[in-house]
Amino acid sequence: MAEQHWTGQLDLTVFNNGESSKARNIFFEKALKVLRPIYLEQSPVPTFYIVNVGGGYLDGDRYRVNVNLEDNAQVTLTSQGATKIYKTPNDHVEQYQTFNLSNQSYMEFVADPIIAYENAKFFQHNTFNLKEDSAIFYTDILTPGYSSNGQDFTYNYMHLTNEIYIDNQLVVFDNMMLSPDKSRLDGIGYMENYTHLGSAYFIHPDVNQSFIDDIYVAVADFQKQYDCRIGISQLPTHGLAVRILTKRTQIIEEILTRVQSYINQTIYHRQINFLRKY
């Protein structure tokens, strides 16, 4: 098998020193970079900004991200800007992200939108390896980019897979394929006349149906205020999945922020930090 040549790769390990979480074993090269951690509002939880220094994903790009959390470590990961997938006439873009969480660790990954432009082909594979008592909050936002004919869905496809393991047992496999060439994305069962899709997972030992019901109450007013649809489902483990359909990125961000705020206040007894990107 030929050796994989990465356009960008990144490795990061976070540990708890008894007072706060710190980073070690940081490695990155080529088109991926991680900035020095920021402790927003004097929080003991570091925030890392992951940067694509090339400004966008191009034809044939391959990316690898590996994040490890040791016992009791906590971290917030985010991007510095949107992930832009430009046209890929010859080869698609691939991104592989692996997150390994040890006992009682917690990772928040709140990324900016993935924007697929005309004739873009994008594949992303995420693997989450958790312990029974570790936790994740992870989000994705998918949006169509500019097209020359003004249509909404002119990318070739966006294919995202998520595998979640708890104590080495596969508990969630989410395989999402958005391919305008093969399906009418504006039809029933797909985007249903919406253009933007938001997703989130929250895995934590305290998640049950009552907790999910409370989150739904916390976000219910958005469906009255905006043209959007929100679905929250219990996963076949102690976790939940959120799906949002709308026509604006900002609406998805508001809803996911409300979900994240409820989680942090209820379970971790703290406020979320404003990530100050703009």
Swiss-Prot record:
Statement: the UniProt record of this protein carries the keyword Cytoplasm: yes
GO molecular function annotations of the record: nickel cation binding
GO cellular component, as recorded: cytoplasm
Compartments in which it is found: Cytoplasm
InterPro entries: UreD
Keywords: Chaperone, Cytoplasm, Nickel insertion
Domain of life per record: Bacteria
A family per Pfam: UreD
Subunit structure: UreD, UreF and UreG form a complex that acts as a GTP-hydrolysis-dependent molecular chaperone, activating the urease apoprotein by helping to assemble the nickel containing metallocenter of UreC. The UreE protein probably delivers the nickel.
Function: Required for maturation of urease via the functional incorporation of the urease nickel metallocenter.
Family membership: Belongs to the UreD family.
UniProt name for this protein: Urease accessory protein UreD
Gene: ureD
